[in-house]
Amino acid sequence: MAEVANNEQQGPQFNIQRVYTKDISFETPNSPAVFQKEWNPEVKLDLDTRSNKLSDDVYEVVLSLTVTAKNGEETAFLCEVQQAGIFAIAGLTEQQLAHSLGAYCPNVLFPYAREAIGSLVSRGTFPQLNLAPVNFDALFAQYVQQRQAAAAEAPAEEANA
């Protein structure tokens, strides 16, 4: 009983057990010709997060970033990084846990992924690429709103069928 009471008094717990690169790729499909052209790139960033439960209160979160730089119609480089972390998270409500996995953990992982991308781009001898910070809290809130809107539409569609 004392142990259970002790755990309840501790409240929410969040520990980073490990941060690691799960997958990494850098491609320059049009080299060396791309280096001889005027550099005026259009850079596109795509990102995604996913999580899975490894055991009780232990989760893996993977932040996937894909950066594509096009110089005119040609792809100058394509850089993909999957930055992952193992997190011990306990004492949270379901909603708090979802926010932690969908926003807080990606916030922890993003600087590592940004550094990996910057390093890869630099090693490819392209000009330095500094990715702007990402507001994962806002992205998660948008995701929750979209899911709620989709859930509200689903019963309406069933009623009309």
Curated annotation (Swiss-Prot):
Primary localization: cytoplasm
Places the protein is found: Cytoplasm
Keywords of the record: Chaperone, Cytoplasm, Protein transport, Translocation, Transport
SUPFAM superfamilies: SecB-like
Molecular function as annotated in GO: unfolded protein binding
BP term (GO), one: protein transport
Superkingdom of origin organism: Bacteria
Cellular-component GO terms for this entry: cytoplasm
Record-stated family: Belongs to the SecB family.
HAMAP family: SecB
Assembly and oligomerization: Homotetramer, a dimer of dimers. One homotetramer interacts with 1 SecA dimer.
UniProt cross-references to NCBIfam families, sorted A to Z: PRK05751.1-4, secB
Function: One of the proteins required for the normal export of preproteins out of the cell cytoplasm. It is a molecular chaperone that binds to a subset of precursor proteins, maintaining them in a translocation-competent state. It also specifically binds to its receptor SecA.
PANTHER family: PROTEIN-EXPORT PROTEIN SECB, PTHR36918
Protein name as catalogued: Protein-export protein SecB
Gene that encodes the chain: secB
